[in-house]
A protein has these predicted regions:
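Ligand-binding "clamshell"
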Residues: 103-116, 143, 298-324
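Conserved N-terminal structural module of periplasmic/extracytoplasmic solute-binding proteins
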Residues: 8, 23-178, 228-231, 239-243, ...
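C-terminal motif of bacterial Sec signal peptides marking the signal peptidase cleavage site
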Residues: 18-22
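Bacterial N-terminal signal peptides that target proteins for export
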Residues: 1-10
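Helix-loop-helix "hinge/cap" segment bordering the ligand-binding cleft or interdomain interface
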Residues: 115, 139-213, 230-275, 279, ...
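Short helices/loops that flank or line small-molecule/ion binding pockets
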Residues: 77-89, 181-186, 275-284
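Loop/turn elements at helix/coil->beta-strand transitions in domains of secreted/extracellular proteins
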Residues: 33-36, 62-66, 87-91, 140-145, ...
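Conserved small-residue motifs centered on glycine
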Residues: 41, 355-471, 476
């Protein structure tokens, strides 16, 4: 579809939406339209006022009025809890996780079951996979209780300081041994040239219940046949929690070695989320773990000149035993949209979500209105051209959080944060290189009722595990102490939930 066709197609979609609403082909006046209330997390600079032209275009396309309440991501979960307990629910509610809260709200009748409604909305059926729909089934009821938000597939690897590689005369690491040599060189050969021993290979900054976590270093975990979530079998073909994977203790022991030898940031355990990216930009660390979205995020923060000369994105390390470069890919879903069970405009709310999953609605909610939010758009290359005024307009009226679907048939509308042709070309070429050497294997994601309840009812158990893993890496406890806790305290308490998860994964794999 050519960009110049977008507005005319939106006009046609508005007429079609009016027909679906039972208007006999005549659109309703704004006073007659149903009002759909939306509760969604959105960054604070986005303003949903009467002048928001992205919202106005969406209202006209679907023939509804929208009232949008949008707490910022930092406070969204607290506001969500208050809203769900208030008895006055918005019609559409963004839910980041299908966790114990989701299951409880569905069980208590707060969320509308959708099993008998999906067939009425062709775009929801077309754009959302069966695997994603399965993830929005509430375990307690067995009913689909939300509409999945389709997202881009994450290709995990690492971003490295290319200038440091050049200064050290090294190639990007592809194996664990090569990574270790790179880490030693970064720590001992002064790649930034400031004369101080203040550079490190890594500074992990993923977060869990204990604060900073070592379970975000996917590119490194791949060498040990690990990923954060054990939604695939181990080398013996058995489904098991990650604490029982053969690579679990060797991975943590390798990190302990790096820490003892001062090859990773000695203060990583106090990092905040995303702090590793800032340290890469500040020439304090040599690489960060992340998917291609992290690469785009870094590209967005750096100048075009820096992106071209300073940073490169590479695949994860090869498996130590097989030599393969493998990434395991679960269904790409970024939360979901619940419909209030007592909504008086549930059909209009579903019609809105259906439109957001059509090609026209997906483009509108992701890139906006041509001439207002962008100048031109090439769907083949995903190049999106905006003037400075249009860029500012887009930032104040739209966000990555606002689309009802990030992807259409698995593809994003554009490559976010690659805001110049040069950045986009570099990103595309590096992703192509990544895909040429990486074997990607689809794996299921399941919701175990027992595991959901276990997490909700035993937060201290998981926090203790997270803390002890960090304590082992930093040398505060021995391997024997960690093993004693995992094998004699943690795993016995998770055994029933682990067994149920394994059974669900086996069943999902056999489908």
């Amino acid at each position: 579809m050519k960009p110049k066709q977008l507005l005319s197609m939106l006009a046609c979609a508005a007429l079609a939406a009016g027909t679906l609403a039972g208007c006999g082909g005549d659109t309703q006046t704004t006073e007659e339209r149903p009002t759909v209330r939306i509760f969604n997390r959105v960054n604070a600079e986005v303003q949903f006022d009467k002048n928001n032209e992205a919202v106005k275009a969406l209202e006209d396309a679907v023939n509804v009025n929208l009232e949008i309440e949008a707490p910022p991501p930092s406070s969204y979960n607290d506001k969500l809890q208050i809203t769900m307990a208030s008895g006055d629910l918005p019609d559409i509610i963004y839910l980041f996780q299908t966790d114990n809260n989701f299951d409880t709200w569905a069980k208590n009748g707060l969320l509308l079951p959708l099993d008998d409604k999906i067939d009425q909305y062709p775009n929801l059926k077309d754009n959302i996979s069966d695997e994603m729909w399965a993830l929005t089934k509430a375990p307690s009821t067995g009913q689909i209780s939300a509409v999945p938000k389709s997202n881009t597939t994450s290709h995990w690897g690492y971003v490295v300081n290319q200038k440091w590689l050049d200064a050290l005369g090294m190639e990007p690491p592809t194996t664990l041994d090569e990574f270790y040599e790179f880490a030693k060189a970064v720590a001992t050969q002064d790649p930034d040239g400031n004369g101080a021993a203040d550079t490190f290979a890594l500074s992990p900054s993923a977060q869990n219940t204990a604060g900073a976590s070592v379970w975000g270093e996917y590119f490194l975990m791949s060498a040990f046949n690990l990923q954060q979530y054990a939604n695939r079998s181990d080398v013996d073909g058995q489904y098991k929690p990650k604490e029982q994977f053969e690579g679990y203790y060797p991975y943590l022991t390798f990190l302990r070695q790096l820490y003892e030898e001062k090859l990773i940031d000695p203060e990583f355990f106090i990092n905040k989320d995303g702090e590793s990216s800032e340290k890469l930009l500040q020439n304090r660390v040599g690489m960060i773990s992340g998917h291609d979205g992290a690469a785009k995020g870094l590209f967005g923060k750096a100048s075009t000149e820096q992106v071209i000369s300073d940073y490169c994105y590479y695949p994860p390390l090869a498996d130590n035993d097989t030599g393969e470069v493998v990434q395991y890919i679960p269904p790409a879903m970024w939360g979901c949209w619940g419909i209030a069970a007592n909504s008086k405009v549930a059909d209009a709310a579903l019609r809105l979500l259906d439109y957001g999953n059509s090609e026209e609605g997906w483009l509108l909610t992701n890139i906006g209105v041509q001439g207002v939010h962008y100048e031109s758009y090439d769907p083949a290359t995903k190049e999106l051209i905006r003037t400075d005024v249009q860029s500012e307009k887009s930032r104040s009226e739209m966000s990555a959080y606002t689309p009802f679907s990030v992807t259409y048939h698995g593809e994003p509308a554009y490559i976010s944060l690659c805001d110049t042709t040069e950045k986009l070309q570099k990103y595309n070429s590096e992703l192509e290189r990544y895909l040429s050497v990486t074997k990607e294997v689809s794996v299921p994601t399941v919701n175990s009722p027992k595991y959901i309840a276990l997490n909700a009812n035993n937060p201290d158990l998981f926090k203790k595990r997270d803390q002890m893993e960090i304590q082992y890496v930093t040398g505060e406890i021995t391997l024997e102490e960690l093993q004693d806790f995992i094998e004699n305290e943690f795993l016995p308490k998770t055994a029933e939930a682990d067994q149920e998860t394994a059974e669900l994964l086996r069943a999902a794999t056999e489908q």
